[in-house]
Amino acid sequence: HSEARILHSKDRTGAEIEGALEAATSGEGMTGLVIKEDWMAIDIIQKRHEDPLSGICGIWCLKPDGVVETIRGSAVILATGGCGMLYNSTTNPTIATGDGVAMASRCGADIRDMEFIQFHPTALEGQERPFLITEAMRGHGAVLMTVEDHIRWRKEGGLASDYSYMKKYSPMGSLGTRDVVARATDAELKMSGESHVLLVTEHLDEDSLRDSFPTICKRLDEQGLSLGPDPIPVRPAAHYLVGGISVDRFGRGLKDGEVIPGLYAIGETACT
């Protein structure tokens, strides 16, 4: 953007949103709201089996003790996220298994555009589960280089951005759009045979980096790496499900364009 206009909380925006929601739902005045931790939704209950347009009347859940319990209700809202665990490398948590989409499909809802998956271009390499390195870091001035680019830059000197492979793929260089950067990085890795590229921050102020990206710094410290002195090994990883449950503008689940009474889908699990 020509002006910085994205609302964020350093590199912990998601955690801050989650914390605010947790605080709001656990405070006084939230009568009628019951949170069931470690319960797993198994399936949606239809008013008439195999008749999606008859409507929804609840869900079946698997309790931690292995007992299945019925929860009745006039509406079910699916907010189960994406399906990143289908991929070998993903930034998603282990619970992102696409169960909400599967449940909606089994009760007759239309599912759209599941072939479209967004890949984040900079996930920390060498982790059991890739750790997302925010794009804000490239906005801060970090530059993507191949291992060979980095060796050449250290030897010859000059502007770090002049040595980035991204110059071949986008006039914006390392600030290219997420899809362009992810595809470019994948292409470079296939050509080089390397397992990762490097996110270079050596040319940036270390104190400013630590102030702006405390969570990332903490994770890198655990790996024996430091923003500033060390190039960070990164590679693309599955990040966001673009498709999902077909809904209208009110989030109501659809079957052949008709509303399924009582079924709603919001967030990543919906296709909006």
Where in this protein do the model-derived segments appear?
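A glycine-rich dinucleotide-binding beta-alpha-beta segment and adjacent secondary-structure elements
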Residues: 36, 42-57, 62, 212-270
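Glycine-rich phosphate/pyrophosphate-binding beta-alpha loops
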Residues: 86-89, 119-125, 238-239, 270-272
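An anion/pyrophosphate-binding glycine-rich loop and adjacent beta-alpha core
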Residues: 103, 109-233
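Conserved redox-cofactor binding core of oxidoreductases
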Residues: 1-67, 72, 79, 120-125
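Flavin (primarily FAD) binding-site architecture
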Residues: 78-92
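Short hydrophobic core segments
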Residues: 70-81, 104, 263-265
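Hydrophobic alpha-helical segments, especially N-terminal targeting/anchoring helices
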Residues: 62, 107, 145-147, 158, ...
